[in-house]
A protein has these predicted regions:
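Short glycine-rich substrate-engagement loop in P-loop NTPases that contacts/grips substrate
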Residues: 70-73, 109-158
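A short, basic N-terminal segment
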Residues: 1-74, 224-225, 229, 233-238
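Walker A/P-loop nucleotide-binding motif
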Residues: 83-102
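Phosphate-binding P-loop
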Residues: 76-84
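Residue-level preference for the first positions of well-ordered beta-strands
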Residues: 84-88, 121, 161, 194-196
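Active-site signature of alpha/beta-hydrolase-fold catalytic machinery across serine-
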Residues: 103, 107
């Protein structure tokens, strides 16, 4: 057990030095892990990411799918610069599209660590957005107009980056989907706010079934990134 520090005898500087001398310095890996757990992971939770997406780093190793994931992340990073880009990650289930999007956010948070920059980001499924915003398009439901307008302003103006998942899995409220999505994308683009769309469709099916005005926005201001490799759920990475 260490001896008590008497600041009257040693002085403040000496007391602090003696206290610090007993602290074992952390390695770079330990500091990164500490910063991730205390700063980045809580933000990912606040942004709406499920626990499985709150992990630092994509899969690594010789598996070709890991290499492809990193290539798509690099492409996503090259497109999004805080100027209203609209990008779609498309491909079969289990290829890691949401992991790519979450890693993009993680990399952004690392870049902002120990700076005054603080990006506001949200991950939502389209069913959630449509369920809340459909009142704007004729179905008032039970939500108040004041709360509705606040939520729409949050999505269109406050968020630096909005990630919308499962954009083709809206059935009951599909009549509102295209109007809501088009309005969100147009308003966010005008405000120079970036948006990432995620779909389990192939690139061809996505282009065929998506509103032409949305495809035009994608072609003009971002693009479609196809993740067309075998699902990680079918076969573990090597």
């Amino acid at each position: 057990m260490s001896e008590p520090i008497h600041t009257g005898e040693l002085g403040i500087v000496e007391a602090v030095a003696k206290m610090l001398s007993g602290i074992e310095p952390k390695s770079d890996a330990e500091m990164r892990d500490y910063n991730f757990k205390t700063y980045i992971a809580p933000k990912l939770e606040m942004f709406g990411f499920e626990e499985r997406y709150r992990k630092d780093g994509l899969c690594d190793g010789p598996d070709e799918r890991c290499k492809l994931q990193r290539q798509k992340l690099a492409k996503l990073t090259n497109v999004i610069h805080g100027k209203g880009a609209i990008v779609a990650l498309v491909g079969p289930r289990g290829t890691g599209k949401t992991y790519i999007a979450s890693q993009f956010v993680i990399d952004l948070l690392w870049a902002e660590l120990h700076t005054s920059k603080c990006s506001w980001i949200r991950y939502e499924k389209l069913t959630t957005i449509v369920g809340r915003l459909k009142a704007f398009y004729g179905d008032m439901g039970t939500i108040s107009m004041e709360k509705l307008e606040a939520y729409r302003a949050f999505l269109t103006k406050a968020l630096d980056l909005l990630i919308i998942d499962e954009i083709h899995e809206v059935a009951e409220d599909s009549k509102h989907k295209d109007r809501i999505l088009t309005d969100l994308l147009d308003t966010r683009y005008a405000a120079k706010k970036d948006t990432i769309l995620i779909s389990n469709q192939s690139a061809e099916e996505f282009e065929r079934t998506t509103n032409p005005s949305i495809i035009d926005r994608l072609n003009e201001h971002g693009g479609i990134i196809s993740c067309a490799w075998q699902s990680f759920r079918d076969k573990p990475a090597i």
